[in-house]
């Protein structure tokens, strides 16, 4: 049953945010989306985010410019002098970490939530097999507290904004299974950190995506071999 409320989803164009978008369509009355241009090497993901939000039929899709992240040095996603590794994720934070990225993104999404009086903000983080610090439950609860403490809407209406994270505690394969049940068009999603068409198939996010499909007995649509 749908909740009689609204939500704004952080949509990157990748697998997890697509699954969250389709789940939100099922669970909420009004669904908005926001994507971010932050100087990422894989900026092509925004084209896929647009296609996904159009197919999902969201109320509105915002593209937020985040220029200050474009100057972040040391992250392979934004620093042109740092190569995207051809390896799986390490145990600790990888070189593809953009410091405070999700905190920046949630803050921007919260601004839209305040303006449009949206009660929920959705982010498709899954902490079990993610090496990123800002995909953990501790981060989500702290971000939610900060959003509510600074929200004009909350101050006026006395209701809370919830950071909706239904995939927290799941693996990427778990999220994929949910997306398949919901009918997510995975052929319209994109996950490669190198920003190539077709995806490189070698970077950590490509590898994790390919492995998730293998785990459910399927081939990634991007790498499906002709029979």
Swiss-Prot record:
Q: Which CDD domains match?
A: QueC-like
Q: Which cysteines are joined by disulfide bonds?
A: none
- Per its record, what are the GO molecular function terms? ATP binding; ligase activity, forming carbon-nitrogen bonds; zinc ion binding
State the UniProt keywords alphabetically: ATP-binding, Ligase, Metal-binding, Nucleotide-binding, Queuosine biosynthesis, Zinc
Q: What class of enzyme is it?
A: ligase
> What Enzyme Commission number(s) does the record list for this chain?
6.3.4.20
Q: How is the cofactor bound?
A: Binds 1 zinc ion per subunit.
The entry assigns this protein to a family as follows: Belongs to the QueC family.
**Protein name in UniProt:** 7-cyano-7-deazaguanine synthase
Question: Source species, please?
Answer: Persephonella marina (strain DSM 14350 / EX-H1)
């Amino acid at each position: 049953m749908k909740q009689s409320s609204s939500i704004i989803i952080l949509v990157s164009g990748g697998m997890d945010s697509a699954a969250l978008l389709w789940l939100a369509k099922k669970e909420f009355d009004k669904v908005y989306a926001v994507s971010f241009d932050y100087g990422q090497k894989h900026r092509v993901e925004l084209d896929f985010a647009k296609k996904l939000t159009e197919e999902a039929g969201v109320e509105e899709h915002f593209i937020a410019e985040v220029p200050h992240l474009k100057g972040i040095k040391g992250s392979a996603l934004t620093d042109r002098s740092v190569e995207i590794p051809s390896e799986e994720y390490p145990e600790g934070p990888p070189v593809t970490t953009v410091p405070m990225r999700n905190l920046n993104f949630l803050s921007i999404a919260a601004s839209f939530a305040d303006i449009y009086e949206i009660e929920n903000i959705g982010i498709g983080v899954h902490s079990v097999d993610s090496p990123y610090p800002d995909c953990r439950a501790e981060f989500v609860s702290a971000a939610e507290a900060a959003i509510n403490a600074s929200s004009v809407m909350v101050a006026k209406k006395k209701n809370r904004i919830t950071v909706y994270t239904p995939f927290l505690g799941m693996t990427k394969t778990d999220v994929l299974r949910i997306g398949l049940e919901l009918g997510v068009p995975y052929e319209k999603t994109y996950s490669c950190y190198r920003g190539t068409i077709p995806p490189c198939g070698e970077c950590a996010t490509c590898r994790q995506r390919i492995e998730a499909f293998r785990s459910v007995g399927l081939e990634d649509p991007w790498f499906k071999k002709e029979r």
